[in-house]
């Protein structure tokens, strides 16, 4: 069948949805002009980080939310449901589109294609009260943003992250994942992490590539 233009435009944007290691654990099936099916998968068999497929499940949710945002540009709202009796490793989601005249574009629509990853050091100066309010207001009403600002709080978080990194970087299973998911000498990648997004300097990148041979 010929894919209707609005659905094609929505899916063209939806493929920008974030996923762990940019693995994009999904496939699209267009049923008709108002119904698509997302065939989800996960990477638990080979990716240490995808414990019980939860990371992929989060990616499925990010995809559905991106579809919702993209659909707003077509004056379409969505409803979705996961099919019953589908395996956790191959979840299937039915997504239906409903016309909604005058539906405003979602404020996040312009940012779908400008999605970036920041793994480098950020500025060290404290957030302003206005910035804190903006972050708090961006969360859903049922969520709370907690700011850890004291020296002891930041020290405790740093220790926790260091211990987590030590486990990841000394675990053979994680080594295999890192070797497979990085695309070296690349700024962009279709289905991996490009080297420039890893967040290391050129010399460290060369060392990493040599170690991971």
Language-model-detected regions and their locations in the chain:
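Acidic, surface-exposed loops and disordered segments
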Residues: 1-213
